[in-house]
Amino acid sequence: MALLPDKEKLLRNFLRCANWEEKYLYIIELGQRLPELRDEDRSPQNSIQGCQNQVWIVMRQNAQGIIELQGDSDAAIVKGLIAVVFILYDQMTPQDIVNFDVRPWFEKMALTQHLTPSRSQGLEAMIRAIRAKAAALS
């Protein structure tokens, strides 16, 4: 995920945005930085239920035990939210993911209070799915 910032830089960049329009544009930009998801990865087993838009998340564990995430969505803002979640879970093992609470990061970014209820529910669905897959691997 060399194209994406680390957690601390994400937070700094987000807080530098002057208003929510800039923050949404930054989220969309993060989504554009995600690598292209292969067509064969857009399968029902990688589809996230509970999202208003189509969302696919692929989780693989590398030889060092670190989880590598790939994902995509048919909506630009949702794809950006996928990127934010991936940044928060970057370089973690399955057990790290299970133990890590992303909510304090969302609070620092004031993210969830500026999302529509359906986007917030979709974000929670993504996090639940990632944590469930990680729990199965740990």
From Swiss-Prot:
Keywords annotated in UniProt: Cytoplasm
Protein name: Cysteine desulfuration protein SufE
Pathway note: Cofactor biosynthesis; iron-sulfur cluster biosynthesis
Gene: sufE
Species the sequence originates in: Shigella boydii serotype 18 (strain CDC 3083-94 / BS512)
Listed Pfam families: SufE
Alphabetized HAMAP family for the sequence: SufE (MF_01832)
Primary location group: cytoplasm
The organism's place on the tree of life at top rank: Bacteria
